A protein has these predicted regions:
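Residue-level recognition of short loop/turn positions
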Residues: 55-56, 132, 161
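Thiol-/selenol-based redox modules, centered on thioredoxin-like
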Residues: 151-190
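Structural micro-motif
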Residues: 123-125, 142-145, 149-156
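A short beta-strand-turn-helix
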Residues: 40-43, 49-68
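N-terminal targeting signals for export/organelle localization
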Residues: 1-48, 190
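Structural microenvironment flanking redox-active thiols in thiol-disulfide oxidoreductases
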Residues: 83-123, 133-138
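Short active-site neighborhood of thiol/selenol oxidoreductases, capturing the structured segment around
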Residues: 61-83
Length: 190
């Protein structure tokens, strides 16, 4: 009888160990894959593009020559990090205006999604719909995650001359707006 009880206990112990080991080795989603190596560098002329904004109107980068352009790419409307980043740009918008800067947000979301996001958050700058993902790719901000394509969280500060003045890769939404404002202030001194 003791042997049977010991045998059962051994089997149960091995089963628990096997389940625990399986949980430990389950695969986690792969990290996002980006084409960041293709991103234009500081000093280069910013690649030109035209995209529809949150109102469905066509917006071209060249429209903003003579101004600083904060071209920020972000993954998805209505997500926590993207909402925080947009709110901080909105909060600081008077400082950007004073610095002769415009803010343009770009993601792979649709015009309708951008419109809803702008309305819900009361955004006072334009969001551009890169639905074919070509601009994200051109700026090294195309990201694949779990089989979907998004824009990676990168920002290109474009000078009034149309050249990229500074590149911010994989930014932190909480402090990014202040970081960009500081860069504009520093670069404006030169």
């Amino acid at each position: 009888m003791k042997r049977i009880v010991l045998g059962i206990m051994l089997c149960l112990s091995l089963s628990v160990i096997a389940v625990y080991a399986q949980e430990k080795t389950e695969t986690k989603p792969a990290p996002p894959v980006t084409n960041a190596e293709a991103a234009p560098k500081a000093g280069q002329v910013a690649p030109e593009f035209t995209l529809a904004n949150d109102e469905g109107k066509q917006v071209s980068l060249k429209q903003f020559r003579g101004k600083w352009v904060v071209l920020y790419f972000y993954p998805k409307d209505f997500t926590s990090g993207c909402t925080l980043e947009a709110r901080n740009f909105k909060r600081d918008s008077a400082h950007y205006e004073k610095a002769n800067a415009v803010i343009l947000g770009v993601s792979t979301d649709s015009v309708d999604s951008h419109k809803s996001f702008c309305e819900k958050e009361g955004l006072n700058f334009k969001l551009l719909a890169d639905t074919d993902k070509k601009v994200s790719e051109m700026y090294g901000s195309k990201m694949e995650y779990n089989g979907n394509i998004y824009s990676a969280r990168n920002t290109f500060l474009i000078g009034p001359d149309g050249k990229i003045a500074k590149v911010f890769m994989q930014v932190k939404p909480m402090t990014h707006s202040e970081e960009v404002l500081a860069a504009i202030a520093e670069l404006s001194k030169k």
